[in-house]
Amino acid sequence: MEQVHGIPGLERIRLGSLEPRIITPAAAERLAALPKLCPHFHLSLQSGCDATLKRMNRHYTTGEYFESVESLRKCFSHPAVTTDVIVGFPGETEEEFGCTREFLEKVGFYEMHIFKYSRRAGTAADRMPDQVPDGVKAWRSGELLELERSQSVEFRRHYIGREAQVLLEEQLEIAGERYWVGHTKDYVKVAVKASGHGELGENLLVTVPVGGFLTDEILI
């Protein structure tokens, strides 16, 4: 990563999905020393309950996961932490689901990808007892999607009243207006009106003031 950071002309580096255990205090410090690194970290969680994680054969605990997130937050001022969560894994009780929800609330993510467990023939999970009914999975998924929406809006609010550096990527028409839309370094979408800004273009870095929400997912 440090070698990639030294490539001339490269303005942004964004990491893909990471194992939580990779993010140690020392690793977070080294990453924070790279100005071109986008502070967007996708740390796959799967469940916020240690008992469920054990059945999933995940090699970390919620405590270790939380330490990784805290390491990032100590080194970056406003890191975007995103994750994946599976609901309805075999044996997931109401109590275990409650633990997951509480843990997600404790961490506070920018975005969460919520999946309902689906059986796959030949897997160890497919042979497990206490398969969760589809209706229960759907309800649990809905509960976490609501939480995800509220946390995501709260994360985006950080930018309102501030200036943001945005990498413009595409033109879109929203409510009859043309906009250039791109991402901040922590992967928040921001739009800039195309009219009156003829100098704007694809792959251009601009610094713009952010006043509020254009849509639920895009700031302006």
Locate the predicted segments by residue.
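Conserved, mostly hydrophobic/aromatic
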Residues: 15, 43, 84, 104, ...
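Terminal RNA-binding accessory module
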Residues: 127-220
